[in-house]
């Protein structure tokens, strides 16, 4: 399974945003400094998040970004979908008639990896930004 930096950084940046969302809009520069993520990379990520209406931008000197929904309503799978991140544990195309690796049947461990992928996706469908913010606060105490 491969989760790219784009997906990890999108989640990290949104958790940061969710922590400060009730105060004022948060600038990408502030997120960049706090999380050690390139500002240019954050701009690319937030462009996708804005298009999928996960965040909205606020213009002006006190501008920045705010969540478009409550943190509890934004699930990790929504974030991954917004930045075109797919969790894939099987190498084959599940819909292929050829099976795994171009053969006529599935590979011996196909069902294992397919089941793992389902568990991961179910986890991401249930876990919200609010959960991650609360978890972060509890671990710091």
Identify the residue ranges that each predicted region occupies:
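Short amphipathic alpha-helical interface segments
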Residues: 10-22
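Conserved segment of winged-helix/HTH DNA-binding domains
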Residues: 71-96, 109, 115
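C-terminal regulatory/oligomerization modules of transcriptional regulators
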Residues: 94-141
